[in-house]
Design a protein with these regions (language model features):
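"…together with the soluble PPM/PP2C metallo-phosphatase catalytic core" -> "…together
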Residues: 1-229
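C-terminal membrane-associated helical module and adjoining short loops/tails
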Residues: 210-316
Length: 316
């Protein structure tokens, strides 16, 4: 009953946001870099924040530093969806939020170099998640796969967080998917959505890694990770400014040049990541070997795909 109430309340909150976004003209207009062709409401992913907030309010205010950190990144990302903010301003908010999250993790009891590594990794993951949010269904669907895996791991493998937290966030993702995981999306996640869900997943995966002392759990983000990193390398090889928008991700070429429906592309990413996670859980004793093998396999598939189809992008 608790989750049904949460689901209904989040659904109503999303509908209320649509009215606000429509009235305030918070929209995403298509351009030459877009993978969509119609004006669509932006910022629907703000519901992820409200999912985390709902858990916080019903759990005797658990994880206060994390919630404060999430509030910071959600706020600056939402502002950025409305009007562009400076890069230094965003970095200040993000770094401040990450420091708070590290404190919630208990990371400051470790050596200082762990903090540096965590800052680099977390910044990279948040940016990657933001870059990968470009077609209908991909952010919500991919996040749903990871959250479902985390719920299973938390129950059957090792307990690293209260289960209600994961399930409440899943409710928010289901609400978003109802409006976004379709041919004609009612809304896009916006920076507020992609950044906030990335931050939530980082918090959960970070707790899992700290609890087990095993960094190979990062395999949960391997598909996004390989696509993002290799696309950056590819653009550097093409002497492009990697700070500018583009349409060179593998999923973008599938959707734009190969004309594969957005939902199909998103489903492929979901399925591949789900298969990888199942394989990892079956090979828990060989986590790092499995991670290395998966990265090599994904890199090989990425390179083969680009060799065959990138010419289509160059000709457009």
């Amino acid at each position: 009953m608790y989750y049904l109430i949460i689901l209904v309340l989040l659904f109503l909150a999303e509908l209320f946001y649509f009215r606000v976004a429509d009235r305030c003209n918070i929209i995403d207009k298509p351009n030459e870099r877009s993978s969509h062709t119609k004006v669509t409401l932006r910022g629907g992913g703000i519901i992820f924040y409200f999912g985390a907030l709902a858990y916080f309010l019903t759990s005797d205010f658990e994880y206060p530093w994390f919630l404060l950190a999430l509030t910071l990144v959600t706020f600056i990302s939402f502002v950025d969806d409305i009007k562009s903010t400076g890069q230094m301003t965003r970095l200040l908010f993000h770094f401040s939020a990450m420091v708070m999250m590290f404190y919630q993790w208990g990371l400051f009891s470790l050596s200082w170099w762990w903090i540096v590594i965590a800052l680099i990794v977390c910044t990279g993951i948040i940016n990657a998640y933001n870059f990968m949010d470009g077609i209908n269904g991909i952010t919500g669907g991919y996040s749903l796969v990871i959250l479902a895996a985390l719920a299973y791991i938390n129950k059957e493998v090792v307990t690293f967080v209260e289960a209600d937290f994961i399930y409440t966030v899943i409710c928010s993702v289901l609400v978003f998917c109802f409006f976004n995981f379709r041919k004609r999306a009612k809304c896009f996640a916006g920076d507020v959505g992609s950044v906030s869900i990335a931050f939530i997943l980082l918090f959960l995966i970070g707790r899992l890694i700290i609890r087990t002392g095993d960094f190979s759990w990062i395999v949960l983000l391997s598909v996004y990770g390989v696509d993002s990193v290799l696309t950056i390398i590819h653009r550097l090889m093409l002497h492009e400014n990697i700070g500018l928008p583009h349409r060179k991700h593998l999923y973008q070429i599938m959707a734009n040049e190969l004309k594969i429906p957005h939902i199909m592309v998103s489903s492929i990413y979901m399925a591949v990541q789900a298969i990888i996670i199942v394989g990892y859980i079956m090979c828990l004793g060989y986590g790092y070997w499995y991670l290395a093998g998966i990265i090599l396999l994904l890199c090989f598939l990425y390179i083969c795909f680009m060799k065959k189809y990138f010419g289509l992008h160059q000709s457009t």
